[in-house]
Amino acid sequence: VIGLGCERFNPQELYDAVKATGKPVAKFVIQEEGGVTKTVERAVTVGRQFAAELDRQERVPCALRELMVATKCGGTDATSGLAANPAVGSMVDKVVAEGGSAILSELNELLGTEKYLAKRAVSPEVAEKIYDAIYEIEDVLRGGLDFSLPENRNQLISPGNFAGGVSSVVEKALGGVHKSGTAPFQDVLQYAMPPENGKRGLFLMDYESQDGEVVTGMIGCGSQVVAFTTGRGHATGHPLAPVIKITGNYKTYAAMTECFDFDASDIISKGASVEEVGEKLLELVIRVA
């Protein structure tokens, strides 16, 4: 933990919170260490010590029920909702069926799907949480705009989405929801807050779509691996968990092969089943995790 020394957020608070978990942590305050150079030197020394300790850890087998997968999309095109997202959804269903967990978020890109999501809630209480979360995001985004007008609805998607063949925010939302598969939603999680009482299954995290921030939040909820879909090409990553990059666009995969880990385009180009591709994706997720 590195801080300047006079921020509104005291680095000591973050240090104390991490230490309470039992994880190794160190704190450096630039104004107390004698400047940036000395801070970096001391932090690098401690970081190397932490790395040496981590190198002694060994990977051990664990049950699939211990896995939590974060799902995210970015750089969406028409193939995302047809191939990549359904493949992720199939993988999510398999993880949840084995007692594992998964998270869907990006609520500002799910506007209009709230009834569908609420129908999959495990209880009326969870359904109400889903409605509340999405309606709150919609109120924030509205900002005086009338979303009954097409030109305003289209404010919620990028020029790249249009160029990739996505016709509207409705199509984007209906495609994005496929990442969650078909399992029931167990609860709505707050940002970076793990499920209570060790609950497992499919969850919705209450947060809007900012790639780095939303992924960080889902990792904070307990996700050990991220399934990230993109049709246009999005070379994203994260320092805290592996990000598996998935595309359903064979042209994008061919043009940016080094950026991708999984090609789901066989669903479109070769008629492969979503179930078949989802199984292959699950195998990759298990290897990575």
Predicted region positions:
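Metallocofactor- and cofactor-centric catalytic cores in central/energy metabolism, strongly enriched
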Residues: 1-225, 229-289
